[in-house]
Amino acid sequence: MRRRGGDSFRRAGRRKISNVVWWVLSGIALLLFFLILSKAGHIEPRPSIPKRRYRNDKFVEGMNMTEEMLSPTSVARQVNDQIALAKAFVVIAKESKNLQFAWDLSAQIRNSQLLLSSAATRRSPLTVLESESTIRDMAVLLYQAQQLHYDSATMIMRLKASIQALEEQMSSVSEKSSKYGQIAAEEVPKSLYCLGVRLTTEWFQNLDLQRTLKERSRVDSKLTDNSLYHFCVFSDNIIATSVVVNSTALNSKAPEKVVFHLVTNEINYAAMKAWFAINMDNLRGVTVEVQKFEDFSWLNASYVPVLKQLQDSDTQSYYFSGHNDDGRTPIKFRNPKYLSMLNHLRFYIPEVFPALKKVVFLDDDVVVQKDLSSLFSIDLNKNVNGAVETCMETFHRYHKYLNYSHPLIRSHFDPDACGWAFGMNVFDLVEWRKRNVTGIYHYWQEKNVDRTLWKLGTLPPGLLTFYGLTEALEASWHILGLGYTNVDARVIEKGAVLHFNGNLKPWLKIGIEKYKPLWERYVDYTSPFMQQCNFH
């Protein structure tokens, strides 16, 4: 079948029109694409944000509030002075139980403070006009306070009364603290009492222990050998005495030449012997002798003034009655320990050790941390007592310990003479006997039977007895104060003998904690007796 020519012409025309349409559509699409791109690339400017104007921009150089308050002519100064006075009156009003008036004053104080605050905020001075009503209202209240006798004179009287009441209260608290501290210092710790009981039991049950100690003391010629280093301790405290002996032995360059003469009382005699018999092998060859003062037949009331005074009813009442003497005499002065023969035995050393020529006396509250053999070669220049002086401050001069209102003291002793300390003393017993030092002690002890020359302890009679007979030793030999005050660590490190004098003994709970390790390092906590009695 033949195709007609017209049909072929129409088909070619339709194809041409179709191509044109596609080209037109493509062009439109391209135009739209470029239009979109141009819109995306163009960033329209944002509307500008007006800059915020802060209040500080409006500030101008204005009033200095400090200068305004200090100016005597300013209104602010007047308002501030009223506030200060009103605050004082508020306190007095409250103490006087006038609570309504105190509230009125407080309210007006707040109003005045608001007035000052507004002036400081706007940085311009207060004017008379704006502050007149506030000042007037406060003045009315201050006038009322004066009418109520809240003026300066009354305030001063009230303050004086308050101060006096506080001082009395503080004095009462201080006195109670002193009493309780004294009681705590005098109390025997339960563990120490337990140790004494257990050691006493061990001594009487262990016959081998008794036999060993007797044999050793019978053949020991060291006890009277004056070429050796003789130390004496008078104590009823087993642990304290053991620390003195242990520390001396461990720090001695020649412990085999060290001899300790211990004197205790009847109650602790067996326990003291048991302790040193058990621990003798730990003392590096140190010789230890234990005695009790009850065995000294010469120690009786006919010879010893202190024992004679103990038979006096007034003395017994003073120390043992328990009456408080209306508080006139401090409790520490009435301590019966100051009549103990273990305290006064230091004045009888030549009688206790008749064969010895030189001894070093140690208190039981000391720790030895250096070799002490050099003490025995010190020249005392014909003096009897070698001691460390304590007169770096006026507190430790003679007038501190003695009653210089008494003519006998005033006529014989310089009040500014330098004091010294018991606790570590070198005694030349040859000179002692030659000068009859014990007789001098007896003289002054008998003169003080009514306690008018001195009140307390063994140091005052010691100062009188050894007056002019004492050679000053270098200070590092004897460091004092570890039982009541702070001591420089460098001084402690250089010290040969550390003394825990005072109430705060290292074996008590009230002892100064930072000094306890100096003492505890010489305590044998591994001992079964110590562990049984809960020593720690």
From Swiss-Prot:
InterPro entries: GAUT, Glyco_trans_8, Nucleotide-diphossugar_trans. GO terms for cellular component: endosome; Golgi apparatus; Golgi cis cisterna; Golgi membrane; trans-Golgi network. The chain crosses the membrane at residues 17-37. Pfam families: Glyco_transf_8. One of its GO terms (molecular function) is polygalacturonate 4-alpha-galacturonosyltransferase activity. It is a single-pass type II membrane protein. Keywords: Cell wall biogenesis/degradation, Glycoprotein, Glycosyltransferase, Golgi apparatus, Membrane, Signal-anchor, Transferase, Transmembrane, Transmembrane helix. Glycans are attached at residues 64, 246, 300, 403, 436. It is an enzyme of class 2 (transferase). It is found in: Golgi apparatus membrane. Pathway: Glycan metabolism; pectin biosynthesis. Its EC number is 2.4.1.-. Expressed in roots, inflorescences, siliques, leaves and stems. GO terms for biological process: cell wall pectin metabolic process; guard cell morphogenesis; mucilage pectin biosynthetic process. Residues 38-536 are lumenal. Disruption phenotype: No obvious phenotype. Reduced galacturonic acid content in cell wall. Residues 1-16 are cytoplasmic. Gene3D superfamilies: Spore Coat Polysaccharide Biosynthesis Protein SpsA, Chain A. Its main location: Golgi. The keyword Transmembrane helix applies. Belongs to the glycosyltransferase 8 family. May be involved in pectin and/or xylans biosynthesis in cell walls. This is Probable galacturonosyltransferase 10. It comes from Arabidopsis thaliana (Mouse-ear cress). The gene is GAUT10.
